[in-house]
Amino acid sequence: MAEHFLFIYNTDIIKNDPGGNEMAILEVNNVKKIYTTRFGSNKVQALSDVSFSVEEGEYVAVMGESGSGKTTLLNIIAALDKPTDGEVYLNGRRFSDIKEAEIAKFRREHLGFVFQEFNLLDNFSIKDNILLPLVLAGKQYHEMDKRLTPVVRKLGISELLSKYPYEVSGGQKQRAAVARAIITDPQLILADEPTGALDSKASDELLSLFSSINNDGQTIIMVTHSVKAASNAGRVLFIKDGRVFHQIYRGASSNEQMYQKISDTLTVLAKGGEHDA
């Protein structure tokens, strides 16, 4: 898990016109992903013409059964994988135009990551884990310290900074991971099953924290199997067989009403029903 973290830091809107929506911070246009076996004898299409956009300040959950393509989609948005065809834009910048040597810097400067298993480095203190993206970006200590204080205060982990990951709870680890994600002031936070390793109480606290961060203007995309987690989002995008199956917008719905809408859609999806995106 630590190696995965270091790799990332080191190394109903359907839209096809990248310049047509000035509010969109992220645009995914006709993205396909085909995996080929080692000797090229078999091909698996993980994504098929996926198109959607995310506006600045949106909180979008992505759901789908295992193997539906949602993790592949997240990896492409994270610039960890490349589409076979199609384009992804972040604030108008096309991913395919970014040179390989610049990808790690692009991730550090524009994306924040929150993982299911926290991906904290055990031999680093909580403070050092949070500051690591800034260290890798070459920031001066006084600037790092200036950014750290308001972030840890907001997340309620100021007293944990000198501790190590093995000395704190799962919920506290995930708060530290969120702090690490937002300390760079990213344009987009990508969360992969962020409540998956947490108990019910810690999950509720994390979801409340995500809502608070989103209310401050942070754009979030969260992949999740949890109906409860997804019901906190402003929009839920469902992936089935590598395609956008359906989207639900919160509107004036409460979390309870969103929960029911999501559950109903998942029931249709599980039965193999058809639904327009």
Name each model feature, range by range.
Residues I189-D192:
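Catalytic Walker B motif of ABC-type/P-loop ATPase nucleotide-binding domains
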Residues R243-T267:
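Conserved beta-strand-loop-alpha-helix hinge in the C-terminal portion
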Residues Y164-V168, Q172-Q174:
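Conserved ABC ATPase signature
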Residues M63-E65:
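The feature captures the beta-strand-to-loop junction immediately N-terminal to the Walker
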Residues F124-L132:
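Short coil-to-helix segment of the ABC ATPase nucleotide-binding domain corresponding to the Q-loop/switch region
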Residues G86-R94:
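Conserved ABC transporter NBD signature motif
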Residues I183-Q187:
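A short, proline-enriched helix->beta-strand linker immediately N-terminal to the Walker B motif
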